[in-house]
């Protein structure tokens, strides 16, 4: 199978082909996901919670993400590899440039940043210097203390309009991909139709161009709170590779997320 690039995902959007993403943090799981046909793998700062045991993602460092990015890179040959930029690793454009370079040199094809209008200069700077950017709007976990917890965003008209405006602005600044997290499905659909770049949803309904889940949720090994938008595919299939295949197939068919896994 040919390598997935940002152009591949753009073609999927234009053709109406749903694509599937997942988090991974090591070579073995990444290789299994890659061989089953996952289109994009995110080395998420979620590693702070699912691997390191923290209550949120804030303690994660660029060195942490770079280490796991290098591990995942060794396990894959097809999927697009996206690396999260951790909390306070991109507070200024110059800081972002330094840390994004570290992640790209570790093997990432793209870096992901959380935020809207304040990030536009940084997105343009990175893009112009050869570092592809994925934006992230809605529930941005690095801002959990500003939000007062892991809460759905964009529920009122003012904030919904702000998220839409920021999506368009990120696209204009050069972002090639966008993640929407924990926003109303109707808003996610509006944004997906409004932008030309591919949109990946998590807790954002079924009308985004692609979906992403944390691997620990897909495999049913998450401890504590389990998000409504997640689904334990291992319980359904009994085998890891079959679980990933079921996830891919359900997204492609439009069966996931179902109403059961959609936030209102």
Curated annotation (Swiss-Prot):
Record text on cofactor binding: Binds 1 Mg(2+) ion per subunit.
Transmembrane regions listed in the UniProt entry: none
Molecular function in Gene Ontology: 3-methyl-2-oxobutanoate hydroxymethyltransferase activity; magnesium ion binding
Cofactor(s) the protein requires to work: Mg(2+)
UniProt-listed Gene3D superfamilies: Phosphoenolpyruvate-binding domains (3.20.20.60)
Cytoplasm listed as a keyword: yes
Principal place of residence: cytoplasm
Entry annotation: catalytic residues: 181 (proton acceptor)
Stated family: Belongs to the PanB family.
PANTHER family: 3-METHYL-2-OXOBUTANOATE HYDROXYMETHYLTRANSFERASE (PTHR20881:SF0)
Protein name, as recorded: 3-methyl-2-oxobutanoate hydroxymethyltransferase
Organism: Shewanella denitrificans (strain OS217 / ATCC BAA-1090 / DSM 15013)
């Amino acid at each position: 199978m040919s390598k997935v690039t940002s152009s591949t995902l753009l073609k999927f959007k234009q053709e109406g082909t749903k694509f599937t993403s997942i988090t991974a943090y090591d070579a073995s799981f990444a290789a299994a996901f890659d061989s089953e046909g996952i289109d994009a793998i995110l080395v998420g700062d979620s590693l702070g919670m699912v691997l390191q045991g923290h209550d949120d993602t804030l303690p994660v460092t660029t060195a942490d993400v770079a280490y796991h990015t290098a591990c995942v890179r060794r396990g894959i040959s097809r999927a697009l590899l996206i690396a999260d930029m951790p909390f306070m690793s991109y507070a200024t454009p110059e800081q972002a440039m330094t840390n994004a370079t570290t992640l790209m040199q570790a093997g990432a094809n793209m870096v992901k940043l959380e935020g809207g209008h304040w990030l536009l200069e940084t997105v343009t700077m990175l893009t112009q210097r050869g570092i592809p950017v994925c934006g992230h709007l809605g529930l941005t976990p690095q801002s959990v203390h500003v939000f007062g917890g892991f809460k759905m965003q964009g529920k009122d008209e003012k904030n919904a309009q702000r998220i839409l405006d920021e999506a368009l602005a990120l696209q204009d600044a050069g972002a090639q991909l966008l993640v929407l997290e924990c926003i109303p499905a109707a808003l996610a659909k509006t944004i997906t139709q409004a932008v030309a770049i591919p949109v990946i949803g998590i807790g954002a309904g079924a009308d985004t161009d692609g979906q992403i889940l944390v691997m620990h949720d897909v495999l049913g090994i998450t401890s504590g709170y389990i998000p409504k938008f997640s689904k334990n595919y291992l319980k359904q299939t009994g085998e890891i590779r079959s679980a990933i295949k079921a996830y891919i197939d359900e997204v492609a068919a439009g069966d996931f997320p179902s109403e059961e896994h959609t936030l209102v």
